[in-house]
Regions:
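Glycine-rich, low-complexity intrinsically disordered segments
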Residues: 1-141
Length: 141
């Protein structure tokens, strides 16, 4: 299944493959020492969203590289104040039937790689760290 990716209102060129969207909540065990000191209850604790990886064929579009360069610019001369590199990213899964769209909240690139595949095609990979995601109600057909 491929994914169409957009940020800043622009669709990024080329079909992408995306890693899984996951939300993980850690569990804490607590005891109520007054009522039953030997009974343990499990409650939710901190929720984390692991990074997602976008993978696409290497082409002329420089959107992945340009965004990654905003986070860690190559220092030449005085280092300017970094721009706001966090973006709202929309992932639109393409396939058969009605598929949902998701929005990554405050996403930013943590890694950018250019990979040489055994089939001879170069690919680029962008790893996005984000603060969470939400499903958008307007599904596409």
């Amino acid at each position: 299944m491929t994914v169409r990716v957009s940020w800043d209102g622009l669709e990024i060129a080329g079909p992408c493959a995306a890693g899984p969207l996951r939300r993980e909540t850690s569990v804490v065990e607590v005891r109520d020492g007054l009522l039953s000191p030997w009974l343990v209850q499990m409650v939710p604790d901190l929720t984390r969203c692991p990074a997602i990886t976008l993978d696409r064929p290497l082409g002329a579009d420089r959107a992945f590289l340009a965004w990654a360069a905003q986070v860690a610019p190559f220092p030449v001369g005085p280092v300017p104040e970094p721009p706001d590199f966090r973006k709202e990213v929309t992932l639109e899964f393409t396939g058969v039937g009605v598929l949902p769209r998701y929005r990554l909240v405050a996403a930013w690139p943590a890694a950018y790689e250019v990979l040489d595949q055994p089939d001879g095609l170069a690919r680029e990979r962008l790893t996005l760290v984000h603060e969470g995601f939400e499903r958008l109600d307007d599904a596409v057909a």
